[in-house]
Amino acid sequence: MKFFVIALIVLLGLLQYRLWSGDNSLPEYFVLQKQIAAQQDGNAKLNERNQVLKEEIIDLKSGTEAIEERARNELGMVKEGETFYRVVGGDRSVSSPSQ
């Protein structure tokens, strides 16, 4: 009986060692859970970005308005007969007269 109790204690010790510091231990599990959460956040952001790009592609394929808007914003193009005005100026501060 004494041998059986000692064997159970040794077995319990080995299992505890494996649980806390061996391969696939609890600390490793918690680290992996954090990595999974970070990866899922990154995947969600990338999925959102992909959705925006898909919508932009569909918009570009379907009509000329998106192409025209892109040409105006990115290439600085102007329609025929339009006048383009560029307002250039830095920060203008209004100074009040000192009394």
Swiss-Prot record:
Segments in the Cytoplasmic topological domain: 1-3
Functional note: Essential cell division protein. May link together the upstream cell division proteins, which are predominantly cytoplasmic, with the downstream cell division proteins, which are predominantly periplasmic.
InterPro entries: Cell_div_FtsB, FtsL/DivIC
Protein keywords: Cell cycle, Cell division, Cell inner membrane, Cell membrane, Coiled coil, Membrane, Transmembrane, Transmembrane helix
Subcellular location field: Cell inner membrane
GO annotation, biological process: FtsZ-dependent cytokinesis
Gene Ontology CC annotation, any one: cell division site
NCBIfam families attached to this UniProt entry: PRK00888.1
Taxon lineage: Bacteria, Pseudomonadati, Pseudomonadota, Gammaproteobacteria, Alteromonadales
Species the sequence originates in: Shewanella sp. (strain MR-4)
Topological domain ranges for the Periplasmic compartment: 22-99
Pfam families for the chain: DivIC
Family, per entry: Belongs to the FtsB family.
Oligomeric and partner information: Part of a complex composed of FtsB, FtsL and FtsQ.
Protein name: Cell division protein FtsB
Source organism superkingdom: Bacteria
Transmembrane segment boundaries: 4-21
Encoding gene per record: ftsB
UniProt cross-references to HAMAP family, sorted A to Z: FtsB
Membrane topology label: Single-pass type II membrane protein
PANTHER family, per database record: CELL DIVISION PROTEIN FTSB
Coiled coil ranges: 31-73
